[in-house]
């Protein structure tokens, strides 16, 4: 089975910014899609498609890690809010569970004329991903911030 999340984690696919943070069971990386600079992905290292299928240890690490990732993301761009969204579908098929931790600015909401899920859909529709060099720069800052926890 092809899994983009697994391929990014094991190096079969290019990951701009590289791995940002790792716990015993979870990985944090910059989003490879069009959800904006500073958007982080929090995903279990193992392939799992549903929260109900997380182990007790994976579940125990998740809350504190989402809190940390949100704090890091909030400082990467001038965010007015940080969205935390569970994504686990591609083409209507369950895929590798991952949380999108997205710092959102008032400028983005104005540019796209949307907020919340409508903003994310508008960003996907436009399809403009951040420049790899900017992702590398932001990933370095994120790594340094995770190191303070």
Predicted stretch roles:
Residues 1-149:
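HIT superfamily nucleotide-processing domains
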């Amino acid at each position: 089975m092809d899994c983009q999340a697994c391929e990014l984690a094991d190096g079969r696919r290019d990951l701009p910014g590289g791995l940002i943070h790792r716990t015993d069971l979870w990985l944090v990386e910059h989003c490879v899609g069009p959800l904006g600079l500073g958007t982080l992905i929090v995903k279990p290292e193992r392939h799992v498609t549903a929260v109900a299928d997380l182990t007790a240890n994976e579940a125990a690490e998740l809350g504190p890690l989402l809190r940390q990732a949100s704090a890091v993301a909030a400082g990467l761009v001038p965010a007015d809010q940080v969205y935390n969204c569970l994504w686990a579908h591609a083409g209507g098929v369950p895929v590798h569970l991952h949380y999108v931790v997205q710092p959102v600015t008032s400028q983005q909401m104005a540019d796209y004329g949307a907020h919340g899920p409508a903003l994310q859909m508008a960003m996907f529709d436009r399809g403009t991903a951040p420049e790899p060099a900017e992702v590398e720069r932001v990933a370095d800052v994120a790594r340094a911030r995770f190191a303070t926890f």
